[in-house]
From Swiss-Prot:
Function: Component of clathrin-coated vesicles. Component of the aftiphilin/p200/gamma-synergin complex, which plays roles in AP1G1/AP-1-mediated protein trafficking including the trafficking of transferrin from early to recycling endosomes, and the membrane trafficking of furin and the lysosomal enzyme cathepsin D between the trans-Golgi network (TGN) and endosomes.
Region spans: Interaction with AP1G1, AP1G2, GGA1 and GGA3: 1-523
Region named Disordered: 1-36, 197-216, 374-409, 589-637
Short motif WXXF motif 2, span: 432-435
Region: Interaction with AP1G1, residue numbers: 386-610
Biased composition (Acidic residues): 19-29
Source organism of this protein record: Homo sapiens (Human)
One Pfam family per UniProt: Clathrin_bdg
Motif window: WXXF motif 1: 28-31
Record note on quaternary structure: Self-associates. Interacts with GGA1 (via GAE domain). Interacts with GGA3 (via GAE domain), AP1G1 (via GAE domain) and AP1G2 (via GAE domain). Component of the aftiphilin/p200/gamma-synergin complex, at least composed of AFTPH/aftiphilin, HEATR5B/p200a and SYNRG/gamma-synergin, which plays a role in the AP1G1/AP-1-mediated protein trafficking from early to recycling endosomes. Within the complex interacts with HEATR5B/p200a and SYNRG/gamma-synergin; the interactions are direct.
The protein's name in its UniProt record: Aftiphilin
Major localisation: cytoplasm
Motif position, WXXF motif 4: 478-481
Length: 936
């Protein structure tokens, strides 16, 4: 059995070795078929179980059922299995997969595309009993799943990490679970080793990330998952590919690009530092004792590094490297948290607080990480020189201005905290593609970027930008959050290998000179910037080196102008000194225009200018300035938003096209013919006339309506029309008895017998029964009576008129009174009860109120004044007031309770319906005198 192979066991019995012949013996069929349905999301994947390298069948009871972490979709994983049959029951068969030679198991999530290498601790320092292994594994687990962290925890000393090419894919993108043993349906951890300690190489943690020592099982069960471990499962937007570390090559493969460092000395340096880190981690665990979680392990590392804060300069290079990689582990933890899309902001804030406490040591860590990978052969062999390079960080007598500058640069623009807040808001358009990979481009840079010097920052960023300028696809969602360190924050330039070496040499000289400058304690920081003659490039380019060799990283704002913190005053002083010694504003504008032109054309290669001033002035690595970072950032954001919108629209278009395939409908052209053309039937050809036979009648109608002056509607008259005759005949009216009266505009059609009918007036006195014709004639005669005839009384006038006889038989009409047999006068005005009492005077009519009658007859009397009319109206109003029924008054004989009286009083009063006459005076208003008389 290979010691580097981790056994992988299936959760369902796969086919036996003898193939399909024994399929009938399996009464439950093939459980592996459920892999296409849905692997259980709860199942057996969330428990911690031991992970053994030796075959399980050697020490596991045969009745144990060992499920695999996922139902596999890969047919290759079912190629070799060993069956173990229970001696008691032949029908129960558990099949265990045999390991694949030369390959380590890889847990692959289909959604996350994350490959996690299971490394063995065969060559761990001080054996399995050393607690340093636990600490190292914890540190390694923080770095798993995030290629942004190019931390030594990802590499092994004297070992090659080999990755399995065959990938086991999950159906629903669940997290890679660990191996476990089921006993009576429960997942348990076997803390006792049946075969001895040597047989148990490691224990998989709850997330299946990295192996832990067997002796750390209690720690693993009691520990709270670290944020890096929590959010590593949500790295569904990242594509992780393998990291290969060989003796002559260190390859960091992000999505489609690779950053390769081929020098042996760099790998040796990484191996050496990794060994130092393991020793330091072991010592930190000894000092801390038993820990309860990975976060506490990190805290112990932080405390050790903090205690060694300013005494580092007294130590040699190995100790310094040890502290640097201790801090780089903490650093890598923050970058591993970026895998979570939803909680990235909260985690960044938390990491920012941690980094602010360790800002000095963070900068040192980044510098040493950078130097350990990228320095030349000369620098590797000179530990004293590297110790001198970091004197400014280690010096306990750092100038307060320098400390403020260092703290500000770390908290605002440097390290993980600044990159989380400053640069993530301004993402380069070329990298703003998907949520797909949070830090593919920054996978090799973030630990080296924080706190780096100006020249080395340029070298790192420009080399990374050489490989990662165009790696995101247009169809990506939210882009690479880690790319902002490599591409969007820095100048988009390309640095060749020769420039890198030259920059590395410049770095050593710069740090040495900076140390000399800071050692005196009198030379201000601003003078370090005097080397940039010929351009004011630090306005919006990478900041220059300061006394603490810790320049601001360039943000997407106005760089030094927008830098917050105590170092603003120093920056402004530097700006003033440089303005005096260097070129004018006009030169700055010209250079800005020139660089803007080159920026628009293509990626501009990096230009290194070494300007030597006075002997005391250090060399500075100047980067050509471009247009204002604000303008560049805004342009990038606008273009990136446009590109993202275009990509999303393209995706939606493809989705709609797939869901709703377009159906080609031929366009039918219809000729719209004008009405005039249709009416000209004589000009139409015969075929057209035959083609429209059904519309012939409609065309005839339009022909009749052509001349609006001769339209039928204008010539139509109701009188004498066909419809009018039909109506009269249906009503039984003879047209000969119709009299047209009135003017021509408003003719009035009345019956012939009603020619003299006027306004209805009350009858004077029913002396004798009169026919309707006589009544109508009398009313008409009265209406046309001249005023001089009114001198006589109405009775005399009525008697002097001869009755008018109407010929009912010749008119064709029937007398309604005769037909009904009525012989009495129909009172059309008032329908009050007829009073038969003898008290009725000759001036009143039975059934009519005397006041109303008096009011009516007063109009007919000739008087010099209207006194009679007003008096009659006053008497009428007084009568109405006496018999007013506006308010309900219950009768005296009614015996009602108070509540009933209140209810009845609230009801509407309808007693007015008992009145004889409903009078609504609208024109007559009594005078005050008559009203007083009526009241009196």
């Amino acid at each position: 059995m290979e010691p580097d192979i981790i056994r992988m066991y299936s959760s369902s019995p796969p086919p036996l070795d003898n193939g399909a012949e024994d399929d009938d013996d399996d009464e439950f069929g093939e459980f592996g078929g459920f892999s296409e349905v849905s692997p259980s999301g709860v199942g057996f994947v969330d428990f911690d179980t031991p992970d053994y390298t030796r075959p399980k069948e050697e020490f596991v009871p045969s009745n144990h059922f060992m499920p695999i972490h996922e139902f596999s979709e890969n047919v290759d994983s079912l190629t070799s299995f060993k069956s173990i049959k229970n001696g008691n029951d032949k029908d129960i068969t558990a099949e265990l997969s045999a390991p694949v030679k030369g390959q380590s198991d890889v847990l692959l999530s289909t959604t996350s595309k994350e490959i996690i290498s299971s490394e063995m601790l065969a060559t761990s320092i001080d054996g399995m009993e050393r607690p340093g292994n636990l600490n190292k594994v914890v540190e390694q687990r923080q770095n798993v799943g995030t290629l942004e962290s190019f931390s030594p925890g990802d590499f092994r000393t004297n070992m090659n990490v080999v990755h399995q090419n065959k990938q086991l894919e999950s159906c629903n993108g669940e997290k890679p679970p660990c191996l476990e043993i089921l006993t009576n349906g429960f997942a348990v951890l076997e803390t006792v080793n049946p075969q001895g300690t040597d047989d148990l190489d490691n224990v998989a943690d709850s997330k299946g990330r990295k192996p832990l020592s067997t002796h750390s099982t209690e720690y693993n069960l009691d520990s709270v998952p670290s944020p890096a471990e929590e959010f590593a499962d949500f790295a569904t937007f990242s594509k992780k590919e393998r990291i290969q570390l060989e003796e002559i090559e260190c390859a960091v493969l992000n999505d489609r690009e690779a950053l390769t460092i081929r020098e042996n000395n760099k790998i040796n340096r990484v191996n050496e530092l990794n060994s130092v880190k393991e020793v330091a981690l072991g010592r930190s665990l000894d000092n801390k004792g038993d820990t309860d979680g990975e976060d506490q392990v990190c805290v112990s590392e932080i405390s050790i590094v903090t205690n060694r804060g300013f005494s580092v300069e007294k130590q040699g290079l190995p100790t310094l490297q040890q502290d640097e990689f201790l801090q780089s582990g903490v650093q890598s933890k923050a970058w591993s948290l970026v895998d979570s899309a939803d909680n990235s902001e909260a985690i960044r804030r938390e990491q920012c607080k941690t980094e602010e406490k360790l800002d000095l040591l963070t900068s040192k860590c980044a510098h040493l990480c950078m130097d350990s990978v990228k320095t030349s052969d000369d620098e590797v062999g000179s530990p004293k020189e590297e110790s001198r390079k970091f004197t400014n960080f280690q010096s306990p007598n750092i100038d307060p201005t320098e400390e403020n500058d260092l703290d500000d640069s770390l908290s605002v623009k440097n390290g993980d905290s600044s990159n989380d807040f400053v640069t993530c808001n301004d993402i380069n358009e070329d990298d703003f593609g998907d949520f797909g990979d949070f830090g593919s481009a920054s996978g090799s840079t973030p630990p080296f970027v924080t706190g780096t010097q100006d020249s080395m920052s340029d070298a790192t960023f420009e080399e990374s930008s050489e490989h990662f300028p165009h790696f995101s696809e247009p169809g990506d969602d939210f882009g690479e959050f880690g790319d902002i360190n490599a591409v969007s924050c820095q100048e988009e330039t390309i640095l060749t290998k020769s420039d890198l070496k030259q920059t590395s040499d410049n770095l050593s000289e710069e740090c040495q000179l900076a140390r000399k400058s800071s050692g005196t304690g009198t030379e201000p920081v601003a003078k370090l910037k005097n080397g940039q003659e010929g351009e004011i490039g630090h306005f919006d380019s990478v900041p220059n080196i300061q006394d603490d060799c810790n320049g601001f990283q360039d943000s997407d704002d106005f760089a030094d102008f927008s830098s917050a913190g105590p170092s603003q005053v120093v920056d402004w002083n530097a700006f003033e000194d440089e303005q005096k010694d260097s070129c004018s504003w006009a030169a700055f504008g010209d250079q800005q225009a020139t660089e803007s032109h080159h920026r628009k054309e293509a990626w501009q290669s990096h230009r290194t200018d070494e300007n030597i001033d006075t002997p005391g002035t250090p060399k500075t690595h100047s980067v050509p300035s471009a247009t204002s970072k604000g303008a560049v950032a805004s342009g990038h954001l606008q273009e990136s938003a446009t590109s993202v919108q275009t990509a999303l629209l393209n995706r939606l278009e493809r989705i709609f096209e797939a869901c709703f395939p377009s159906i080609l409908v031929p366009d039918a052209e219809e000729e719209v013919t004008s009405l005039k053309h249709l009416l000209e039937t004589s000009t139409l050809p015969i075929k057209t006339r035959e083609a429209l036979p059904e519309s012939g009648e409609l065309l005839d109608v339009w022909t009749e309506l052509q001349d609006i002056h001769d339209a039928h509607g204008l010539r139509y008259q109701w009188g004498g029309s066909h419809s009018n005759k039909k109506l009269l005949s249906s009503l039984g009216i003879d047209t000969r008895n119709i009299l047209f009266t009135g003017n021509k505009k408003q003719p009035v059609i009345v019956p012939m017998y009603a020619a003299g009918l006027g306004m209805l007036e009350p009858t004077k006195e029913p002396l004798k029964p009169l026919s309707a014709a006589e009544k109508i004639a009398s009313i008409g005669q009265t209406a046309t009576m001249s005023p001089d005839m009114n001198t006589c009384t109405s009775d005399q006038f009525q008697e002097s008129l001869p009755p008018v006889q109407f010929d009912w038989s010749s008119s064709g009409l029937t007398n309604p009174l005769d037909a009904s047999g009525g012989s009495t006068l129909l009172n059309l005005d008032f329908f009050g009860p007829v009073d038969d009492s003898s008290s009725s005077s000759s001036t009143t009519i039975p059934g009519v109120d005397p006041e109303l009658y008096e009011l009516t007859t007063s109009k007919l009397e000739i008087s010099t004044s209207s006194l009679k009319v007003t008096d009659a109206f006053a008497r009428l109003m007084s009568t109405v007031e006496k018999t007013s029924t506006s308010t309900r008054k219950p009768k005296r004989e009614e015996h009602l309770s108070e509540e009933a009286i209140k209810v009845i009083a609230g009801l509407p009063d309808l007693t007015f319906m008992h009145a004889k006459v409903l009078m609504f005076p609208a024109t007559l208003t009594p005078s005050t005198s008559s009203q007083e008389k009526a009241d009196g």
